């Protein structure tokens, strides 16, 4: 089945219609009904509850969550994909029990209004807000960010209403079922990867700001510096040799770890910065990308404990940094990667024109 273009999806969102967006098979492998929150009516809530049957949620920007004074449901996010649920909400006025389609639509409208105030909603309630990552799908390739992107691109406030599509037997609908669902209900359907690719053509959140040679103990690298215009973080890329889009490039996307990179503590199965640079130097070409996100204190403490106990703590994938790293790699001309990492799942990196052809384990 031919998928719809992003332009077609945006136009339907602009008209107050619902669309379906699918993510990658190696992530949630699900499809969500998505629409702009400002256009949501009782009939849309009823359709989602009756036909899609997933959890009806309301993605919104961090700024709107702060405006409505919505704290995160859990101070430390332990979910597999980093979905940021806030406390649930209800409209302060105009609702009864809060669960009916009309009541939930009223709550969505109260929270999405351009002049919304914290006093317009109460907690708990029957609508579940999700805080989107600043930068949208260029920062995190999730349905939360996709809903806010589509609403913004269609001229609405960056907030939406989403609901996962489930099969009649309660299992999650995959691509074949989602395409059949879209055809049955005359709903346009697309992918998050296509949305990312569309945004990459028209906008980006990471800009190159400087480039200079770097003479290191492991060879003569080229240092390219980038700034994230959304978060303000500075990222650095160490490149060596010629980067060819048609040939796999040896790549390390590295988060600094004081134990591993400064104190040189051995951590089996993990690449140190020095080891990654040495591997690129030995190969004669490649990229070591240093992401400028600060070290999480809890993660650092966990690594200290694992060093003392000779155990290994699994560090969760930080999906919010995948977008920044992908933009930088694409800017450097990387397309195919031999990634210095244990096998990991990345959602919709094909939208950045990137492909992992091999995972290279640490020695």
Describe the role of every protein-language-model region:
Residues 1-363:
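Catalytic domains of riboflavin
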